[in-house]
Amino acid sequence: MNYTNDIRDYLALEIEILKKLDVEQINAALNLLDETRQKKGRIYICGNGGSAATASHFQNDFNKGVSEYIDVPFRFHCLNDNVATLMAIANDIGYEEVFRFQLRNNLEENDVLVAISGSGNSHNVIRAVEYAKEHGCKIIGLTGFSGGKLKELSDISLHAPVNSMQ
């Protein structure tokens, strides 16, 4: 089987999407993350499904990959990495609280929340965002589709104008 045309079509689509990203918002996000690092603030990150895997990978890339080469390391904390904590909260309180409840125990004013939701409407992510905003934290939102509520609530919105989560 020859996938050459499929590969070309896929790459062309990816290039078009990348061209539509707002580089000013990406720059603002990087500056906020760096300012938070320099102030020794914490950066919380969360998402569901594939976005959870992305959140976990972000934590790894910044805490190990980037921090290995700088004096003041990043302090990323992925809210979906502790399965026992997630399951206890989901079982005893409700899945809509799995991220907000963890923030309640740890969040401080100079911290940042990076929230990832393809639709921008994941209820548990939105509850965490609202809680963090109420406590003076900045929000970086990563969204697709129309961006949903997360795009509206984010201080910095990294929105990919796509209608697929591939």
Specify the residue positions occupied by each region the protein language model found.
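Glycine-rich phosphate-binding loops that contact phosphosugars or nucleotide phosphates
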Residues: 51-166
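Residue-level recognition of alpha-helical structural elements
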Residues: 3, 22-25, 51, 133
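Generic N-terminal amphipathic, Lys/Arg-enriched alpha-helix
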Residues: 1-21
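A short, well-structured juxtamembrane/interface segment
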Residues: 21-39
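Hydrophobic packing residues in well-ordered alpha-helices of helical domains and bundles
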Residues: 7, 26-29, 55
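Structured helix-beta-strand junction loops
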Residues: 13, 39-40, 153
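Short glycine-rich phosphate-binding loop at a beta-alpha junction
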Residues: 42-46
